């Protein structure tokens, strides 16, 4: 098997419980390099939990999970694999989670310097290039609180990309944004998808999902209820749950 | 019998040269004790938020014991009690510094715990997602933010500890109150001398307040 067909994420029979709540129920999911997967579903359906398992921010209780050929074990028992996976998998959060005590540029250069061991000069020059790419080069010396939400989220994207990840996770990246700022963040993500980045995106932006996704997954009560190419899933949903969910979210 | 209340300014001013030698002692005990207490506080404060129960409980016991007993009892225990155990006397200055250290350490560990716990979970999640280890996340992301939030409470504790050193006159260390007592024993001008003693404490604590306000303003300017 060569590298292009080998999945970068392989999830088999994954189960997660929060106490008595069964959050993820026997999830099987393979993601191949270059693929853009969008996960949709009602709030509380487990879609955020699912992608947070991929970089070990959430533990699972049973099943197999291999990310970039490192295996994550149930109950978070695999610190070394976890560390390795996290250096190769980037994440963008709903609340941006920028470091407020560091300048925009320092936000972007911190991990490459401390984790990848880049020199300060190298980290700064690649950091500036990334900030330029997401259109915030002129804000490099400001602190995050001086930026708009859309700008902050683009910095967060640049910060994740600075680690040169092989896979990017997006956990509702536009849900905390004012409507007029959603576009600029989606544009940056669209750009990234075009360049061939492997992406797993949890979002409520159905138009964006239809346009960018190679595959859309609908999650209902911790199970993958339905998945397929966007045209198929959005235009001719098979599962009754998918139909009623789409009817609700596409109405407005 | 007629009683007249007369504040004698010349007695007040005259006491100053006799009180001044107490200031270095007061400063030495308070800042020496606070410096050690700061590290004790960081140590137990971090133990207190460890995920491991057997690391948490020593911190809980430490805080309960030294926050729950009077500092006067603590210094008497150290100065008069411990020598019986050790078989050799303890220097009054050392006993004073130790009492401030263990006492402020208990309060500071609670300040540290609160400061670190006040940082949103998203900060450590973002750090970990970038591949930073837990230690790196703490050192570069969590601690610098937590420390800024701790500054007002630490300043408060500093001022309290400076005033607590006045109790150590009972073990004979030559701090401000002790110098006042010695002087009053010969002049009987308690009103004027204690007034000046109070002013000197105020001068120290007020200076500290001003420095802290500047530190806070500078710390916040970054954000």
What does each of the following model-derived ranges do?
Chain A
Residues 2-3, 242:
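Pre-NBD coupling/linker segments of ABC/ABC-like ATPases
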């Amino acid at each position: 098997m060569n590298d292009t067909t080998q999945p970068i994420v392989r999830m088999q029979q994954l189960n997660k419980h929060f106490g008595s709540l069964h959050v993820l129920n026997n999830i099987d999911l393979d993601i191949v390099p270059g693929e853009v997967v969008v996960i949709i579903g009602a709030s509380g359906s487990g879609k955020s939990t699912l992608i947070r398992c991929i970089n070990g921010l959430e533990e699972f209780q049973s099943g197999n999970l291999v990310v970039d050929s490192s295996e994550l074990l149930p109950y978070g028992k695999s610190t070394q694999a976890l560390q390795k996976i996290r250096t190769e998998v980037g994440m963008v959060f709903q609340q941006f989670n920028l470091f407020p005590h560091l300048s925009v540029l320092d936000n972007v250069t911190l991990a490459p310097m401390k984790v990848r061991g880049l020199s300060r000069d190298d980290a700064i020059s690649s950091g500036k290039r990334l900030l330029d790419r997401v259109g915030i080069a002129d804000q490099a010396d400001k602190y995050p609180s001086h930026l708009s939400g859309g700008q902050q989220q683009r910095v967060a994207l640049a910060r994740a990309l600075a680690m040169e990840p092989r896979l990017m996770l997006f956990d509702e990246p536009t849900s905390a944004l004012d409507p007029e700022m959603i576009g600029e963040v989606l544009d940056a993500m669209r750009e990234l998808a075009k360049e061939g980045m492997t992406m797993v995106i949890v979002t409520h932006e159905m138009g964006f999902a239809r346009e960018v996704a190679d595959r859309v997954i609908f999650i209902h009560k911790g199970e993958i209820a339905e998945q397929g190419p966007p045209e198929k899933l959005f235009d001719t949903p098979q599962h009754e749950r998918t139909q009623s969910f789409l009817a609700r979210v596409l109405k407005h | 019998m007629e009683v007249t209340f007369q504040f004698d300014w010349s007695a007040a001013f005259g006491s100053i040269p006799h009180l001044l030698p107490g200031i270095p002692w007061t400063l030495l005990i308070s800042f020496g004790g606070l410096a050690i207490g700061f590290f004790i506080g960081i140590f137990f404060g971090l133990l207190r938020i460890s995920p491991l129960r057997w690391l948490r409980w020593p911190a809980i016991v430490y805080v309960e014991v030294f926050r729950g007993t009077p500092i006067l009892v603590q210094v008497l225990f150290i100065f008069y009690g411990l020598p019986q155990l050790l078989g050799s006397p303890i220097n009054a200055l050392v006993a004073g510094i130790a009492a401030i250290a263990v006492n402020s350490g208990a309060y500071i560990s609670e300040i540290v715990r609160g400061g670190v716990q006040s940082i949103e979970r998203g900060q450590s999640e973002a750090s970990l997602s970038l591949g930073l280890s837990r230690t790196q996340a703490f050192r570069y992301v969590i601690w610098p933010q937590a420390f800024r939030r701790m500054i007002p409470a630490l300043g408060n504790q500093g001022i309290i500890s400076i005033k607590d050193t006045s109790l150590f006159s009972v073990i004979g260390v030559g701090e401000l109150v002790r110098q006042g007592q010695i002087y009053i024993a010969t002049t009987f001008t308690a009103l004027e001398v204690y007034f000046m003693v109070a002013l000197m404490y105020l001068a120290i604590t007020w200076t500290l307040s001003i420095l802290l306000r500047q530190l806070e303003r500078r710390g916040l300017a970054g954000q």
